[in-house]
Curated annotation (Swiss-Prot):
Source organism per UniProt: Aliivibrio fischeri (strain ATCC 700601 / ES114) (Vibrio fischeri)
Catalytic activity: succinate + ATP + CoA = succinyl-CoA + ADP + phosphate; GTP + succinate + CoA = succinyl-CoA + GDP + phosphate
Pathway of action: Carbohydrate metabolism; tricarboxylic acid cycle; succinate from succinyl-CoA (ligase route): step 1/1
Protein name: Succinate--CoA ligase [ADP-forming] subunit beta
Cofactor details (free text): Binds 1 Mg(2+) ion per subunit.
Length: 388
């Protein structure tokens, strides 16, 4: 689950990190009043969406007057912001962040992720702040400095000092950086984060460090024990189909192709998408129905897949391990009858009671195309999607 910038900065402030004075506003009038409370001559106004590239898309501006801030809010609130990280429809803007402008002398990068290889939280810092860190990692990896956090002892001050030295910080800036580093390390573990970024972490003209931006992603599997963060969830930023799928414990990710995929197991789902691509098709989604593929969940899965108008055919690829293929077949038949599926459906069953499941599908009288192998299934669904 992602947080908005203003929410990330609220958490930063709770852990004693320096953030600009700012206010999240729901209406143009609130933005006008917030601008009046900010003492700096210039005010920064930012659209709050779960996407990067806001500045280039016109979603971040600098204004001298309260009226200019209000006009910006009137322009964007209730509209969709399209950036290079969104689809063509963009994401809805329901809040505007109004905050004080800063005198920037230097921009740094500070972030942390869970590194699965080392099984550690790993901090990354760079002197190249304010730009795409992935580009820096690819072109000049030597500019990224890392510190792995031992889960038994947590972040250590000496690690923060080492990073500060490598970033060229001096004097009191080192103490400030260590405080930020320690706060972020504790926050990462306490709130079950998957990723956090401050890009840029700026050195102001006065010589102080300031968290100018904030990005936080929380491990969705840990949300059950993070009630405070659950309240920060903004469903308007999610794909409606993905939100619907989550209610049924279906793992769904919308893609741009024309072949709907329904599979049990994430690994098999990725393999299915790969082989569809290999045979010239384009998957319309990733959908893992999991081990408990009941009729109800299969029905909802069909509804979600078919809510995408680009879907021209559906591939159902089920491996019966714990779940029996004949029960899956009953679910598919019931779902197709209930939903009224009009596009071709290709089904490949393998494993526990697969012959019985295939027999049930064949005797159903429905327009279901059977396949005995994954290659055959991919070939048939690609042909069906092309109308062949």
């Amino acid at each position: 689950m992602n947080l908005h910038e203003y929410q990330a900065k609220q958490l930063f402030a709770e852990f004693g990190l320096p953030v600009p004075e700012g206010y999240a506003c729901d209406t143009p009038q609130e933005a006008f009043e917030a601008a009046g409370r900010i003492s700096t001559a210039k005010k920064v106004v930012k659209c709050q969406v779960h996407a990067g590239g806001r500045g280039k898309a016109g979603g971040v501006e600098l204004h001298d007057t309260k009226e200019g801030v209000k006009e910006f809010a009137q322009k964007w609130l209730g509209k969709n912001l399209v950036t290079f990280q969104t689809d063509a429809n963009g994401q809805p803007v329901s809040k505007i962040l109004v905050e004080e402008a800063s005198n920037i002398a230097n921009e740094l990068y500070l972030g942390a992720v869970v590194d699965r290889a080392s099984q550690r939280i790993v901090f990354m810092a760079s002197t190249e702040g304010g730009v795409d860190i992935e580009k820096i990692a690819e072109e000049t990896p030597e500019l990224i400095h890392k510190a792995a956090i031992d889960p038994l002892v947590g972040p250590q001050a000496y690690q923060g000092r080492e990073l500060a030295f490598k970033l060229g910080l001096e004097g009191d800036q080192i103490k400030q950086f260590v405080k930020i580093f320690m706060g972020l390390g504790n926050m990462f573990a306490q709130y079950d984060l998957a990723l956090l970024e401050i890009n840029p972490l700026v050195v102001t003209a006065e010589g102080s460090l300031l968290c100018l931006d904030g990005k936080i992603n929380i491990d969705s599997n840990a949300m059950y024990r993070q009630p405070k963060l659950r309240e920060m969830h903004d469903p308007s930023q999610e794909d409606e189909r993905e939100a619907h799928a989550a209610q049924w414990e279906l793992n769904y990710v919308a893609l741009d192709g024309s072949i709907g995929c329904m599979v049990n197991g994430a690994g098999l789902a990725m393999g299915t998408m790969d082989i569809v691509n290999l045979h010239g098709g384009q998957p319309a989604n990733f959908l893992d129905v999991g081990g408990g593929a009941t009729k109800e969940r299969v029905t909802e899965a069909f509804k979600i897949i078919l809510s995408d108008s680009n879907v021209k055919a559906v591939l159902v690829n089920i491996f019966g391990g714990i779940v029996r293929c004949d029960l899956i077949a009953d679910g598919i038949i019931g779902a197709v009858e209930e939903v009224g599926v009009e596009v071709p459906v290709v089904v490949r069953l393998e494993g526990n009671n697969a012959p019985l499941g295939s027999q049930k599908l064949a005797e159903s009288g429905l327009n279901i195309i059977a396949a005995t192998s994954l290659t055959e299934a991919a070939e048939k669904v690609v042909a069906a999607a092309e109308g062949k």
